[in-house]
Design a protein with these regions (language model features):
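Short acidic, glycine/serine/threonine-rich loops at helix termini
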Residues: 26-30, 88-89, 111-114, 138-143, ...
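Alpha-helical scaffold segments in soluble metabolic enzymes
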Residues: 24, 28, 91, 115, ...
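Conserved C-terminal guanine-recognition region of P-loop GTPase G domains, centered on the G4
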Residues: 99-161
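A short, flexible beta-alpha/helix-coil linker loop
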Residues: 82-83, 134, 172-176
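Conserved catalytic-core segments of large NTP-driven translation/proteostasis enzymes
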Residues: 153-228
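N-terminal, positively charged nucleic-acid-binding surface of large information/translation enzymes
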Residues: 51-56, 60, 65-66, 116, ...
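P-loop NTPase switch module centered on the Walker A-proximal segment
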Residues: 5-103, 107-109, 116, 147, ...
């Protein structure tokens, strides 16, 4: 197969506390980027595949999904957000080119967020910050942004990491904006920012094909599948 395609491909990990809207955001990013056919039936919470994950609404095993936008491909990795799955977190971060930090506009930064973010910063990733659930009545987006900056400082983020881009969003309603009171139309501003901010790793296309494996799973129709 033509793996030497000129399409730019980058790997993005999404960091979020439980119930901060990560899986719903991924659902709408995929829908708005045109990842599905018009007549395709799409379940909610696409990235929650295991029974326990669907029941509790948490991510235990990292799972990838790809979206195409502006002649680029972004491989989104739904990353565990709990320190109990530290090995899985480190495995994912080691293969990521960038990170998206998703924070609830009312709850703000949580301990589990700090745990994963610390590892991402140590890995040298430069996160995009998205203040999510801005449609909440008790949202306090400006305070949460200040808390987030303080968290970056406390984790010894470098100057580039401290100069993080910020968007305000509602994953459930499917919009993102550069301002708290900005247009609430769609997630295109977030998709554009991901393409602009996350730089793909440099590849030597003269070398033989090599792939970092992300997931091995069984399918009743296709059999064993390896994704990377």
């Amino acid at each position: 197969s033509d793996w030497s395609s000129d399409v730019c491909s980058s790997d993005l990990t999404i960091i979020a506390h439980v119930d901060h809207g990560k899986t719903t955001m991924i659902d709408n990013l995929m829908k708005q980027s045109g990842s599905f056919r018009e007549n395709e039936v799409v379940d909610e919470r696409l990235m929650d595949s295991g029974e326990l994950e669907k029941e509790r609404g948490i991510t235990i095993l990292a799972k990838p999904a790809s979206i195409n936008w502006q002649d680029s491909r972004v491989n989104i990795i739904d990353t565990p957000g709990h320190r109990d799955f530290a090995a899985e977190v480190e495995r994912v971060l080691s293969m990521a080119d960038g990170a998206l930090l998703l924070i609830d506009s009312a709850e703000g930064v949580m301990p589990q967020t700090k745990f994963v973010l610390a590892k991402a910063l140590k890995q040298g990733l430069k996160p995009i910050v998205v203040i999510n659930k801005l449609d909440k009545a008790d949202q306090r987006a400006n305070e949460v942004l200040d808390e987030t900056f303080d968290l970056f400082v406390s984790l010894d983020a470098n100057e580039e990491q401290l100069d993080f881009p910020v968007l305000y969003a509602s994953g459930r309603s499917g919009w993102a904006s550069k301002e708290v009171d900005g247009p609430r139309e769609n997630l295109h501003p977030l998709l554009d920012l991901i393409i602009e901010h996350v730089q793909p790793a440099e590849l030597d296309k003269t070398k033989p094909f090599a792939m970092l494996s992300t997931l091995l799973y069984a399918d009743s129709f296709l059999g064993r599948n390896l994704v990377g």
